[in-house]
Amino acid sequence: MPGLNLTRDEAIERASIIKRVHSYHIFLDLRTDQDVFASNVEIRFDAQEGASTFIDAITSSVKSINLNGEELSTDLADGERIQLPNLAAENVLKIEAEMFYTNTGEGLHRFVDPADGEIYLYSQFEVPDSRRVFPVFEQPDLKATFEFEVRVPSHWVVVSNQPEVKVEPKDCGCGRANTWYFKPTPRMSSYITAIVAGPYEKITSELTNSEGRVIPLGVYARKSLMPFVDAEDMFELTRQGFEFYEEQFKTPYPFEKYDQLFVPEFNAGAMENAGCVTYLETYVFRSKVAEALRERRAITVLHELAHMWFGDLVTMKWWNDLWLNESFAEFMSTLAAAENTRYAKEAWATFSASEKTWAYRQDQLSSTHPIVAEIRDLADVQVNFDGITYAKGASVLRQMVAWVGQENFMAALKVYFDKHSWGNTVLDDLLVELERTSGRDVRAWSAKWLETAGVNTLAVEVENDEAGNISSLGIRQSYAEGFETLRPHRAVIGLYNLVDGKLTRTDRIELDIDGELTVVEEAIGKKRPDLLLLNDEDLAYAKIRLDERSIETAIKHLGDIDSSVARGVVWGSLWDTVRDAQMPARKYVDLVLNNIGKETNSTALRTQINNLSATLHSFVAPEAREETRHRAADR
């Protein structure tokens, strides 16, 4: 329906009329009905005098509309929008309405726990669903403060973005009730506001941040689920994330508290509501699980925490930069895990086996698209919310951080947060700061990496002299048909040799790769290694082709490399090579059978077993399939 699908042009026009939204005061009565709830709002905003616009409100009914003391006809509401005619320079808008509960994870979701019959509510507003809970100018660049007042049954708790000011008991004629009053939020976008209500149980803790402020921490879950919640693990990861992000960003945590809530029937992994993060209950483990699942939960915890700065403190102007919001959090969460948690040895290997594998697969489909996509309306957001947005975006962001230098990247972020706190930005605002700190042409980099689709291939071309020393080493870059872009890459070449039964890195070369052929002068004269690993450390986003000698070494000795990241690069390279019909499938089978028993990263282990299955069923020549399957089964 047109009223539900806000277009970018409509948002731009409305933002030109609404000069500033000052505040929302929102009253919700969540006691009385299983289908609808009362939602009353008072909004103060400045506007172009005499102009008209609309406010978003997906309602069951509208009881009254009062604009600047004048009662307006409820006919101005059509169930999706409310028209606002003849605005003043300074406006006070009061609306009384009823809204629908949902069971779709949009707006205010209502769940009845089959274990005890208790009712649990939680909000989910990204992308455009705060309008299902209260009338609102539903676009990220119309920020305001939000003050919630919520009436609930007396045995419930209510959690929102800010701490509660008071809880006031009252007998309302239909049983005892409490009204929860919350402090106004800082200026922020409506999609990161939140209300969670019900007989949730909680475990509390606290931390002291870099400013010396005490930040209250909470972990919440349903009563029937709370015995399985590992709150101490959540608190440990949260403390490690706070420490890392505040140190790297040189910007203190911007909110007053940090609550994390496991909510039922959640249709996403998690949501970065400011100071009130929600997670799906799958992250509550009721029995022993694979380490990969625990690591995935850790990355999710750190991902949502990163959003408190990038996304919540500073927010995209429109949804076309949603990719940056998500890619940044995915990159930073892995970096935080690698540098400040118990997952230090495995974080980037897991990223390679999961995120980058997903990205490479998505980027070679006919449905691929540039990371920066045109978002003309809200419907476009869902179409482009995919493996390119998340996985390729994060992979390319890692490449960019390597290209500009991590210190320069973090220095740029410090200025970015200082300049734009509590405001909205576009991609160019970040690129400007990156160019200033790095001295690199980041806009040209952006045009090649963010505005075009497809993945390049980087192939090793190496020769040696009679003494076994490298006489020439080149990196040849190519592209797939239809995606004719050669891109700049920052990469590491690892020189690995067999030493005392281990395949050990004995030399390292870091370089820029650009154009069709990059000559590696630094390698000339070095002893040709047993394994010459292009993209060691996995900084580049590209398919890698190894030389034949390196392939043979990997088939026999991949499991003898200590670094799970280096192993992951080889696993990925040879999988791409066989999948592109550049290497016999039997060699990939040999690689897996010889080395899978030494793989310690559980995500890589799962990925390679899946790839082996695909190879045995699809890539091995039909006449050799039965024999090869028996050989695999016997191992």
What are these regions (language model features)?
Residues 71-87, 123-131, 281-300:
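Aromatic/His-enriched, Gly/Pro-containing loop or helix-boundary segments
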Residues 2, 149-152, 168, 223, ...:
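Non-catalytic accessory/interaction domains
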Residues 1-38, 114-120, 140, 442-447:
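N-terminal, polar/Ser/Thr-rich
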Residues 182, 211-214, 218-482, 621-634:
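Hydrophobic alpha-helical and helix-loop surface patches within well-folded domains
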